[in-house]
Amino acid sequence: MQKPLIELKGVSRVFNLGGLAVEVLKGIDLQIYPGEFVAIMGASGSGKSTLMNILGCLDRPSQGEYLFRGESVSLLHRDDLAQLRREEFGFIFQSYHLIHALDARENVEVPAIYAGAGIVEREKRAEELLGSLGLGERLHHRPSQLSGGQQQRVSIARALMNGGRVILADEPTGALDSRSGEEVMQLLMELSRQGHTIILITHDSHVASHANRVIEMKDGQITHRQEPVIRESNQVRSPFGVRHSSILLELFEAMKMAFRSLKMNLFRTVLTLLGIVIGVASVIVMLAIGDGAKNAVLERISAMGTNILVIRPGMPNSRGFSNIATLIPEDMEAIMELDNIIAAMPENKKSVTTRYGNNDQSTSLNATSSHFTKVRNWPLGKGVFFTEEDEKSYAKVVVLGKTVEKALFGEEDALGRFILVDNIMFQIIGVMSNRGASASGEDEDDVILVPYTTGSLHLIGQKFLRNITVAVDDLSRMGETEREIHSLLLARHGGIEDFRIRNMASLIEDVTQTQNTLTILLGSIAAISLLVGGIGVMNIMLVSVTERTKEIGIRIATGARMRHILQQFLIEAVVVSALGGLIGVVIGLGVSALIEGLGTPVYYSLMPIVWAFGCAFVTGLLFGYLPARKAARLDPVVALASE
């Protein structure tokens, strides 16, 4: 004896409407055998559509048991129900429920995508089905370009795509004229003859008369039923068999659908992209400027030498030192006798006026020693530097910075010429190489260098030193050497700490920390823009889910699992964010290059770019998850009923 394909035992369905329990189905008992053509007929509100939703695994009974091929489906997980719909059921709806963004062939292919069918085989299958239904010339027409009858035939082809062992037709002729309606009924009768089990939902007795068995419903109960006509039916098989969908194929399809959806709402997509683009570009530009400023400052400080100790007069933590007379040349000479010292040099600075012919230049005088080039790591450009002999003989010789040379001599050769320094004659013996700006932004080339003995006697008028700069040999002993100098000077100054020692390595570390803090601040400000862009992505995706609720219902009805819907909307969010991130990287690099061209120091590194793009990608994941989760958890019945 043949067993029923579908069996309902005492099935009831209760809805909670505004706190009031409404029983739509009441104790339904029903058996449907393979190959039957059954019409369930009733007036509006009789419960027939609710019954169809339960039969098609779109809804669950509140009470009772639903058996399919002898196995209970009432307690199956949503994904198991999706598999059952995908492999066993095909739906034909009164309002067609085609996805407007897809053409006829693509609409028919939808169930096969979730069945894991390859691109070629599902395209071939869709074309064969549409051709057999007289739509071979309408493969690439969208629903809006098809008549009602043609749209319903596309819906029938979609129902048959995965085999359609059971065809559930909900008022399939309700929106059609009589001729088109009759054509659809003839198609259903032919499918019944081929072995498909047809369950027709209708309120029209004429339409119901095409079925082999009619079941009448009223007020949620079966009021009349004909006995089933059990006959041998052809076994309907899935054209794709049982297979597991490839993750790569799923991702490819989700990506393709994402781009199609974004293209359909191009203006909105551009606005959403703009938020991510601005955020990513801001991060890259801000970090490039911050790193550029940090490196520029560090380069200038490092140019002075990382092995430098600077000793200045004045109490520790006090400010100002120009009028404090505590350091003398003998202190410098004593320091030179210590271990681990390459050289020590004095520096006395003063603003002076230089003159050559009719050209005047106000500049900075630095009265220093012959060790200047070694300690400052500043090579001579041309000529010679003054020597220890020049210092001992109080020689009136001078070495010019490039800025002073150009101001006084233009393109002429300055070597050997005499200039006036505060009306005292000095001979030019050398010109320094180009140095550029200092850490504080001052022009280091706007300087003249003279022996400290000569400068103290003729120009400054005092022998006290403004500072002593010491070059240390072994950097690993920098701290030890600093302590030795401190002890030496403390002893020489009678135990009074009237001097300050600054370690350039410590200064570089402090500056680096300060600049890193500034860079983080700039990056944080820019990251806020990226956060705002992410909120924009979430907002647009929530709107997209609302607008495409019916599409989601269609996809669930045709076999999409929760993960398929989650993937699709999550990938849409990621595509927007990643595309915005990519454009933002390009624009960020372009703006950084423009800023660099205007003279602002900029430093390019891979990490900020990777970080900014990665943040955009993660932003898409994080802010896209909530809308995607909302889409994946939609009730298919509610989704299909939405407008």
Swiss-Prot record:
Pfam families associated with the record: ABC_tran, FtsX, MacB_PCD
UniProt keywords, alphabetically: Antibiotic resistance, ATP-binding, Cell inner membrane, Cell membrane, Membrane, Nucleotide-binding, Translocase, Transmembrane, Transmembrane helix, Transport
InterPro entries registered for this protein in UniProt: AAA+_ATPase, ABC3_permease_C, ABC_transporter-like_ATP-bd, ABC_transporter-like_CS, MacB-like_ATP-bd, MacB_PCD, Macrolide_Exporter_MacB, P-loop_NTPase
Similarity section: Belongs to the ABC transporter superfamily. Macrolide exporter (TC 3.A.1.122) family.
The organism of origin for this protein: Wolinella succinogenes (strain ATCC 29543 / DSM 1740 / CCUG 13145 / JCM 31913 / LMG 7466 / NCTC 11488 / FDC 602W)
Quaternary structure annotation from Swiss-Prot or TrEMBL: Homodimer.
Sequence ranges assigned to domain ABC transporter in this UniProt record: 6-244
Protein name as catalogued: Macrolide export ATP-binding/permease protein MacB
Record-annotated disulphide pairs: none
Classification via Gene3D superfamilies: P-loop containing nucleotide triphosphate hydrolases (3.40.50.300)
CC per GO annotation: plasma membrane
